[in-house]
Amino acid sequence: MRKFAAIFVVFFVQCTHLYSLAQARAEPDPGVVEYLKQSCVYGNSSYINVYLYNSRFQGKNLGNQQSCQDINASLPVVFITHGFTSSAQVSTFKDLANAFVQKGHTAFIVDWSEAACTDGLPGVQFAEYNAAASNTYDIGQLMAKYTVDLMNKCKIPLNNIQYVGHSLGSHVCGFAAKHVKKLINKTMPYILALDPADPSFGSNKCGERICKSDAKRIVVFKTSILGIGENIIGHLLIVFDGGKSQPACSWYDVPCSHSESIVYATGMVSGRCQHLAVPWTAQQRINPIQWKFWRVFTSNIPAYPTSDTTNCVVLNTNVFKNDNTFEGEYHAFPDCARNLFKCRQQ
């Protein structure tokens, strides 16, 4: 039953927009037309609001303007972007921003909620997913321009700037990084992609999604069936607890598992939690006796490390360093590790 529920979620997100748009065209009701004009369906992606987090401000709304007098140019900077039907006001993003601030960063949360269909009518929002997905390109360009403007006006070097994106926000980061390269002919140093959205992107070519070449280092967390997993889009892929559903969430609550990637990142950034992980390639993740159709929803979970395990690693704040050369595909255990055994520090 749970597998069928998961299938329904994925297919509903990807397909229902077709019916809604067809109905809107066939029956041009004035109310529907007016709603669509104000919605993300019409590409309402002309602006972003940037919220500043540092030791002085806990979410100062800068709009799309710079505020160099409020920023310590010597500190590293992180841009955080949300995904579909989300916003900068969601507590998990605030927690992540504050975790970075506590570790000596300036954090910006990029709010593109209107283009992400956050304010859509209940029951209609999922039908607008593809519109939000299409808007990621324009939002990425706006984020890139803001980044370059920050560099020029506030004298912050690109090597001190990182991108973090969740779900569709991961692709926003990818498009932003591509545009930064076009604008200044330099490559972003680091992107953290938190369960990057698979629907509308998973099978795309490199130029139409976040891609390994967008930054010198890309780290990917996978926590749900909504996230890209088999297509290696980063230098380091960390799959938490099989990458389908997470222990803190009900089996049917796919959005919860999707958002747990933010929670894991926050715990690691803050230093409150470190995870043990073992190598886990695509071949190891798939049970050869399973039907191909079910492979999307099931995995071979490896055994938890013991005192005899030598081929394991410790995932901690080092994962977020630009110069960390640790690469590969790993299965991460969701609980905070109390005993590190013989696992290597990364």
UniProtKB/Swiss-Prot annotation:
Propeptide boundaries: 27-37
Instruction: Give an example GO molecular function.
Output: serine hydrolase activity
What reaction is this protein's catalytic activity?
a 1,2-diacyl-sn-glycero-3-phosphocholine + H2O = a 2-acyl-sn-glycero-3-phosphocholine + a fatty acid + H(+)
Summarize what the UniProt record says about post-translational modification.
Contains six disulfide bonds.
Q: What is its EC number?
A: 3.1.1.32
Q: What class of enzyme is it?
A: hydrolase
Record's keyword annotation contains Signal? yes
Q: Where in the cell is it found?
A: Secreted
List, from the UniProt record, the residues annotated as the active site of this protein: 167 (nucleophile), 195 (charge relay system), 258 (charge relay system)
A GO BP term here is:
killing of cells of another organism
- Range of residues in the leader sequence: 1-26
Q: What is this protein's record name?
A: Phospholipase A1
